[in-house]
Amino acid sequence: MQINEIEGERQPVLMIVVGRQRVGKTSFLNAVAQFLRAHGAAFQIWDADKMNTTYNMSVFHRDARQPGSDDPEDVKAWLEERFIDLVEHRFDAMLDIGGGDTPLARLVQDVPVVATLEDEGVRVVLVHVIGPELADLDYLERFAEDDLFAPEATLIIMNGGLVLTGRSNDVAFSQVSEHPAVKAAIRAGGVVVRMPRLACMSEVTDRELSFEDAIKGKPGVDGRPVALFDKTRVRQWWERELPEMFELIPSLWLPQMRLGELARPPISTKRARKARKAAKPAGDESTSLGTD
């Protein structure tokens, strides 16, 4: 049973985030996890980023599961166990694998992970988080060339938080938007979306606050809340700009939301095609995601 044969059917979603170091993978996944859970989604979080010990998913999500060992072969075996568990028990999951030569890359070399999971009715969603540098496309190019880890459900996230202050997003992402690897991914069914910038991201994450707690003015680990106007910035980003981003992502590519207006019917094929045209970033009106 192939994913593209049952486009209208909801399947267990495995969202895997990849990219170079310091492009904002964990920041993206943390924001997405918080937003989806705030809208009623239920899923497991797998934190296999062993290189990032100070800012990882386990800091913000106490239920995140981690491998018991840092040894790459142990982590590889742990990932295989998680995948089997997902197939058997049919739940959604998000995986933060980190950067570099990851255990996931080693597993992919051993077995066709995507094809195996898709044959078992799991929708594998590969998320490439990139900044405006061409080198940020290394993972996308490599996976596409090898054809080992290139599912149809490929999401390219252009991290607006990596654009220098005062620079136009259109200009900043113009080269990567026109890159052959990005265009090939779109032709293959991929979707390109820009993550809106939250200028005070570090003010929230350094305090180990959730975005909702930051809006409510709750104190962080340092005993202080975010500043007054930063609270307003977070509210605008959380309540207006993030929902706009999610509207461009096919709903079947995400864990199912059950609360609020974003718990919408699956995105139509026609609308999905429109979303793919988001490869050309929006202008400066949005406000940034941090780095890993």
Annotated model-derived regions:
Residues 17:
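Hydrophobic anchor at the beta1->P-loop junction of P-loop NTPases
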Residues 21-22:
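Walker A (P-loop) phosphate-binding loop of P-loop NTPases
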Residues 25:
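Conserved lysine of the Walker
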Residues 28:
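Hydrophobic positions on the alpha1 helix immediately C-terminal to the Walker A/P-loop
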Residues 40-54:
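Short beta-strand-centered segment that lines the nucleotide-binding/catalytic pocket of NTP-utilizing
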Residues 91-107:
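Switch II (G3) loop of P-loop NTPases
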Residues 103-196, 201-204:
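Conserved catalytic-core segment of NTP-binding enzymes
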Residues 175-236, 240:
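Beta-strand-loop-alpha "switch" segments that mediate conformational coupling across diverse proteins
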